[in-house]
Regions:
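A conserved regulatory-domain signal marking ACT and ACT-like small-molecule sensing domains
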Residues: 1-126
Length: 126
């Protein structure tokens, strides 16, 4: 899966315009994270079709500022689940650059080496 990052003006309706444009193009959003920094917001969207999402965003006047392949791992809704999921990555010396929850109790994880991270997680049965 791909995480697309956008920097949007912190104005009412901007995120609705972006997500509406993606919806009209048939792009399914599997996860979303955002935070305001001064006059702007940084938005991360987990999409099922990055190429179509980029094109739809561009048609609506939005620019993708970052695109990363990410891990989307199932995570239980219980105390310690996040620590247990991240521990194999830490033990393998993998830096985590991004996390947010996605649909259906899944965690999006941004790392420098996706293959190495998957190997570390799979070694623990994930």
């Amino acid at each position: 899966m791909k995480d697309l990052m956008f920097i949007l003006p912190y104005q009412a309706g901007t995120l609705a315009q972006l997500t509406g444009a993606l919806s009209e193009a048939g792009v399914s959003l599997q996860g979303c994270s955002g935070q305001q920094f001064g006059p702007e917001g940084i938005i991360h969207l987990l999409v099922d079709n990055a190429a179509e999402a980029r094109e739809a965003a561009a048609r609506a006047g939005f620019v993708v500022r970052g695109e990363h392949e990410v891990i989307v791992a199932d995570i239980e809704d219980r105390p310690g689940a996040l620590a247990g999921l991240l521990a194999p990555l830490a033990n393998a010396g993998i830096n985590v650059s991004l996390t947010y929850l996605a649909t259906r109790s899944r965690l999006v994880i941004g790392v420098d080496d996706v293959d190495q991270a998957w190997a570390a997680l799979r070694a623990t049965g994930r």
